[in-house]
């Protein structure tokens, strides 16, 4: 199952279809954004096979300059990939899903390739995949918050930030080998 009503939180056990779905979507995005996409990666909890995740595929598209994506907004929309704006500073958000049912299946984050946010996404995913105990710690936090905030995605997301910050520091130390 892929997809979740906007604003809600529900975690599901990892499903192999998430990686397959992500790969198909990455291939489609590569075709659509070939001139500007430097790299496209599957990120987020659906990219960590050992943990439960919201059934929404997160992808990150790295570009050299955020302005490079503007000419592609209409083309992406023609392929049911809808621009939602700058969700956080320096990051453009596109979504896919069943908009009539207010369900989202994919969050596509467009950011500066090899910048701080790009490295955060990649390092976090790789760190949790490399260290199962850290993934379990993150999953426990997610499960607790999902039970508490099933209809409040903002509070769920905010509740994870302290742990994510600590794990990111550990991930950067691990990645740099220090």
Where are the language model's segments positioned?
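Short amphipathic alpha-helices in soluble, non-transmembrane regions
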Residues: 71-79
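Helical scaffold of the NTase/Pol beta-like nucleotidyltransferase catalytic core
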Residues: 1-41, 165
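Active-site nucleotide-donor binding segment shared across nucleotidyl transfer reactions
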Residues: 29-70
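Conserved catalytic core of two-metal-ion nucleotidyltransferases
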Residues: 80-115
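Catalytic cores of NTP-dependent nucleotidyl/adenyl transfer enzymes across multiple folds
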Residues: 116-178
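Short amphipathic alpha-helical segments
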Residues: 7-9, 55-59, 104-106, 124
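Conserved residues at beta->alpha junctions
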Residues: 63, 112, 158
